[in-house]
């Protein structure tokens, strides 16, 4: 595999960008190699600056559910850009986008757009504290909710990938207000609320974890969590930055039939542009300025490019309803990987929900962060490098999801599994 130009660019990038990247996992540190520099993408494929072509299962970490450079989305962005890129003032597109979100997500009556998933979770936490008058928050080990001070405790995603236990720069006083519990363990939740229930403002959770790899709790777990938070007057926040509009048009809420108090969104709702959102019941959302006392603002929030790209993507998803076919393709990939694991005796637990999938290199059932961490990281790193050499681009971390798009064909999946078989042979 040619990498000369990528290597040269990475060397240059390290002189100007911290670590040569703008997000840590992109540095490929955990897989023992230098990163690719991507030049272009189309459909299910990306090409790097050395001309290598890959079937892409990263999809910009999830937003590109219709694949790269979808013509309708690109044209929508171009059309709006002709009139200006940002105004810092209300536009009609913001209303149309808000209507689409409220129409789709069962629990959302009002929404506020921001510029990233991190902004969305940060703002939702602030709102929950302002609304309830309480200080403590509950999160779950291995769940990643962006790089917010109060939420980086025992986090997944890059924090897990790089084996960072915490991070300097977060005062102990902040961390002390965050209670971290094991994911998928309702007994721990019940015990915590018995001790601290009167002080807990909110519980924030990925309804299907994707940032420790894909881990799905039971519907009963979510139902009990909903009951407990209601009982103690704490808000339940579902972080659907990853699952929103990906697992179903109404997100994980549509799958589970459970309505949280607040929901955070990102990724898919931007059509590949920077965007985030948080929303919920009108009574709660009207605590946000300028109607209420909880302040939150943003220079580029609701900018026309993100609204145009996101709105067109949501319109296509609503019109086409690709979710059954995405699930079918996900199942095909899941079953193929599981078959290869069994055929070659390579321990692997394959977890999937819809078009999100992770193959953990462990013989344990992966139900939480502790079992996810039992994965053989050296074996994953070797598998990643072998697949990359054969033209399959996976997330450079054991603790991330692979994503499918409508642009991935059955032929893409067949090709991926054929190449995976060659790689499994080399893992023996």
UniProtKB/Swiss-Prot annotation:
Pathway where this protein functions: Porphyrin-containing compound metabolism; protoporphyrin-IX biosynthesis; 5-aminolevulinate from L-glutamyl-tRNA(Glu): step 2/2
One cellular-component annotation, GO: cytoplasm
Entry-annotated residues carrying N6-(pyridoxal phosphate)lysine: 267
CDD domains named among the record's database cross-references: OAT_like
Protein name: Glutamate-1-semialdehyde 2,1-aminomutase
Cited InterPro entries: 4pyrrol_synth_GluAld_NH2Trfase (IPR004639), Aminotrans_3 (IPR005814), Aminotrans_3_PPA_site (IPR049704), PyrdxlP-dep_Trfase (IPR015424), PyrdxlP-dep_Trfase_major (IPR015421), PyrdxlP-dep_Trfase_small (IPR015422)
EC code: 5.4.3.8
Family: Belongs to the class-III pyridoxal-phosphate-dependent aminotransferase family. HemL subfamily.
GN (gene name): hemL
Reaction catalyzed: (S)-4-amino-5-oxopentanoate = 5-aminolevulinate
Cofactor dependency: pyridoxal 5'-phosphate
GO biological process: protoporphyrinogen IX biosynthetic process
UniProt-recorded Gene Ontology molecular function terms: glutamate-1-semialdehyde 2,1-aminomutase activity; pyridoxal phosphate binding; transaminase activity
Pfam families linked: Aminotran_3
Enzyme class, spelled out: isomerase
Superkingdom of origin organism: Bacteria
Subunit structure comment from the entry: Homodimer.
HAMAP family: HemL_aminotrans_3 (MF_00375)
Cell location: Cytoplasm
UniProt keyword annotations, A-Z: Cytoplasm, Isomerase, Porphyrin biosynthesis, Pyridoxal phosphate
């Amino acid at each position: 595999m040619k990498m000369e130009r990528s290597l040269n660019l990475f060397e240059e990038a390290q002189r100007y960008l911290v670590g040569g990247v703008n997000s840590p996992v992109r540095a490929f540190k955990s897989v023992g190699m230098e990163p690719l520099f991507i030049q272009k993408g189309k459909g299910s494929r990306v090409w790097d600056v050395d001309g290598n072509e890959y079937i892409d299962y990263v999809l910009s970490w999830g937003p590109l559910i219709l694949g790269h450079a979808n013509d309708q989305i690109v044209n929508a962005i171009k059309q709006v850009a002709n009139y200006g890129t940002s105004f810092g003032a209300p536009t009609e597109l913001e209303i149309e986008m808000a209507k689409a979100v409220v129409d789709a997500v069962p629990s959302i009556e009002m929404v506020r757009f921001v510029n990233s998933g991190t902004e969305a979770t940060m703002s939702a936490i602030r709102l929950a504290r302002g609304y309830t008058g309480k200080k403590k928050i509950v999160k779950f080990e291995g769940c990643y909710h962006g790089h917010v001070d109060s939420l980086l405790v025992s986090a997944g995603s890059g924090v897990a990938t790089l084996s960072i236990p915490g991070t300097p720069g977060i005062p102990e006083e902040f961390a002390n207000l965050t209670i971290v519990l094991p994911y998928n363990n309702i007994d721990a939740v019940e015990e915590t609320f018995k001790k601290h229930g009167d002080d807990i403002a909110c519980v924030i959770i990925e309804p299907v974890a994707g940032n420790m790899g894909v881990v799905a709790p039971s519907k009963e777990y979510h139902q009990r969590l909903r009951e407990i938070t209601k009982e103690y007057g704490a808000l339940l926040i579902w972080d659907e930055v990853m699952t929103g509009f990906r697992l179903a048009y109404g997100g994980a809420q549509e799958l589970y039939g459970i309505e949280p108090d607040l929901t955070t969104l990102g990724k898919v709702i931007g059509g590949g542009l920077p965007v985030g959102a948080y929303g919920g019941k009108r009574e709660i959302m009207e605590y946000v300025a300028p109607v209420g006392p909880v302040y939150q603002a943003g220079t580029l929030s609701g900018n026309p490019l993100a609204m145009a790209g996101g709105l067109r993507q949501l319109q296509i998803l609503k019109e086409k309803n690709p979710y059954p076919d995405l699930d079918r393709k996900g199942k095909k990939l899941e079953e193929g990987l599981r078959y290869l694991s069994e055929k070659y005796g390579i321990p692997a637990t394959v977890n999937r929900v819809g078009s999100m999938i992770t193959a953990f290199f462990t013989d344990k059932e992966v139900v939480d962060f502790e079992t996810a961490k039992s994965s053989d990281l050296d074996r994953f790193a070797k598998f990643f490098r072998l697949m990359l050499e054969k033209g399959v681009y996976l997330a450079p971390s054991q603790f991330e999801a692979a994503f499918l798009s409508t642009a991935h064909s059955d032929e893409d999946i067949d090709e991926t599994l054929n190449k995976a078989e060659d790689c499994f042979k080399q893992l023996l």
